[in-house]
Every structure is written in structure tokens, then in C-alpha cells.
Amino acid sequence: MARKYSHIIVIGVDGAGSWFKDADTPCFDEIFKDGAVTYKALSSKPTISAECWGSMLIGVGPEIHKLTNKRVSVLPYSVWSKNPTVFRRIRKAYPEAELGSYCDWNPINKGIVERNASVNKQTARDKELTPLICDYIKDKKPDFLFVHFDSTDGAGHSNGYGTPEHIKAINEVDKLIGDIYSSIESAGILEETLFTVIADHGGTNNENGKGSHGGWTDEEKYVTFAAEGKDIVSGEIKEMNIRDLAAIVLYGMGIDAPAFNEKGWTAQIPKGLFSDYDGEYLDISHLTGAAPRISNEHHKSELI
């Protein structure tokens, strides 16, 4: 399979749910005005960060990868796992590829991205992280870059999801997304880049105005995904699960994905996303996910 893009950049926005549609996001709106967008991509069960980011980067459900926030905070992801991340798959296919993972929440770098994939890893708070990302893009022109922003989830936990404070945090992240997109233009690689934004989960609020997540309400399970690049079909994506990100990345890199298997790889290419792809899209709504639980925790950003 031929490689479609020289560069793929994924911006992950923790806890943003589907609220991009309610926020003031001029950068997001301009970037994806001719792209593919959905505010109803389905999260993973339970709707908690490690379970969700793990599913997106590995292409399997939480019941398969078994990652939790506690686990990724203390244990590195096995370099021998039969379910490798997209980083390891790309490294195998392209030994000289430049790979980056710039995350506010360091457990992604510590407990999901493999140690043997030769990934440039950085950790800082969102606003401090963004200039590092922009410099990295201009200097290294990465083949694949994953970015994780976390201020949105912190605002949701502290002030409630969908509240003015939470929406304001999304507004602020929109500016950072705009800065990153501008750096791609400055690097002269925009025409060969697949640029995506994705959230992992939303959240619900208690009587004290605090937010949590982990359940399967509409507010928790529906999230934003957007993609822009050549061969992306403009319009609404009708059906998608967040784990499909792994399949999208591999397809864009020209790497054959594993065969669909309900006990393993369940990432798929959403119908109508790419103009040159017309494969079937299988229903996985009956898959149970991992054991349910609720998260009230605020992530901490620790330097590597």
C-alpha cells in the first residue's frame, strides 16, 4: 500500500467531548472548513483517559490493552506486546522515521508509547508545550507527531463539563491548535500533511459543580474528531469510534493494518473519510469494553 502522507499530526484534547461545537474556535473552524468533522465519534468504555488514549494509539479496546490511569502512571507499556502502538508499527515500517509525542499528561509517554520506538518525547503544560511543538515541527518535520493537551479536562473536573469555564478552556486550546497549524505552514509541509484533532471523552457534573467521567452518557461518550488533508472528503463523518484513529494513521502512512478481530484489532477506516477508500465499517457497539469505573482525578504533568 502506497504511503499517502509524508506527515501526520494528531492533536488530542483531553476531556473536550463534543463541546468544540459550542466553543468559540475560529482556528478549528478555519482549518476544517473543507475537512471531515464529527461531534459524535464514540469513545471507549470506560470513558477514562488511559483507556481512551490507549485505544486510539493501539487500535484495540480497553478490555484488550488493559491500560488504566494508575497503570500508565507507574508501568511502561510492554515493548513485547502483541498489540503495539502506532509508534512501534511506524518504526518497524520506516526505521528512519522522525516520531514525536508531546504530552501535557506524561503517563502517555511513560505508560503507552513504547520505550523502544525511538520517539522524541516531551512533557509540559499546554501553553509551555506549544512553542516546543512548533519548533519541533519546523526543525524536524516529523513523519508522525502525537500531541496531548490537558487543560480542558482540568477545567471540566474543576468547574463542570460544558460550563463557561470548560468552554473557555477549549477556546484557549483552539489558539494553540492554530499556532501548531501555522508552524506546519511555516515548515512548508502543509500539502503533504494529514492534520487531525480528537477528544477522548466528555464528562458529567455533580450537585457541587464538579465534573467526572467514566460512564456512558451522551455527554461522556460522544467526542469531536476532525481531519484535514488531501483525499479527505469534506463533510460530516457518519460513524466512527475513537480507536479508529489507529487505522487512520496506518492508512495514511501506507502501512497494512491487522485484520479485524473482535478479540484484538477493532480499529477501522470510517466510511467516506478518504476519497479513495470504500471498505465496509463493522458495528462494534456490542463489545463491552473494560470494567466500568468513574474518574474524578485531575491529571498531573510531570517532566520526563
What are these regions (language model features)?
Residues M1-I304:
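Feature captures the catalytic ectodomains and active-site-proximal regions of enzymes
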